[in-house]
Amino acid sequence: MRNITLFFLLGICCITSFAQETNQRLKISHVCGDFYVYITYQSYNGQKMSANGMYVVTNEGVVLFDTPWDTTQFQPLLDSIYVRHHKKVIVCIATHSHEDRTAGLSYYKKFGIKTYTTKQTDEICKDRNEPQAQYTIDKDSVFTVGQYSFQTYYAGAGHTPDNIVIWFPKEKILYGGCLIKSIEATDLGNLTDANVEAWPITIKHIQQTCKNPRYIITGHQDWTSTKSLEHTLKLLEEYKKK
């Protein structure tokens, strides 16, 4: 009887675990060392689409790049990070003005997290009455938090007029956001604010400045390939031919 009961309970646990996995709204994946990608989801053109953000765990606290696309995951992300690493998020930098990057800025400011965008992003958010960061970055800057240093780099317009990338030169990690398309992407995605003419030049500037990246984190879909810069150029070339 005890064996039957145990088997039944194990079965229920497996079913519950499977249900949680299939309904998951927040996923955290390890990149390397202290670097992690977090993924949330929204519906785009009638399909479920992932949005990738990144965070790095430092001696002083956690630095977050972009905020969740799914607004229900602002707090679960903070909670998940604290449970995993026993550290709080202390800095958040959004890489452009779209909601899949900036939606949580106001929420995170309430918790004393220092939030940043470029001045250009801030002006766009202000004009559209959308969440703004507490601080603005006037030019390409180097941040040092704990044992890690990284650069904010504006290479030019592309997906949006204000998109920046984050470059960790020592670790060779490039966080590209929506400016860099995943190798899974079959088109350029949302072009509402895009500058398709400038975009290839911007990507080439990134290739020249952020050389030989070991990891390239794209804004959406699979981020595990280092060929995403080349793939973005290919998609742009295909778009020009249409």
Regions found by a protein language model. Give the residues of each.
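Short, electropositive alpha-helical surface patch
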Residues: T226-K242
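Metallo-beta-lactamase
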Residues: T22-L26, H30-V31, G61-V62, W69-D70, K119-G158, T160-K227, ...
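Conserved beta-strand hairpin/beta-sheet module of binuclear metal-dependent hydrolase folds
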Residues: H30-L77, V165-C178
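Structural recognition of the beta-strand scaffold that forms the well-ordered cores
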Residues: V37-I39, Y55, V63-F65, I90-A94, ...
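Active-site metal-binding motif and surrounding structural segment of the metallo-beta-lactamase
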Residues: N59-G61, T72-Y116
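Divalent metal-coordination and catalytic microenvironments
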Residues: D34, V56, D66, I81, ...
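Bacterial Sec-dependent N-terminal signal peptides
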Residues: M1-T22
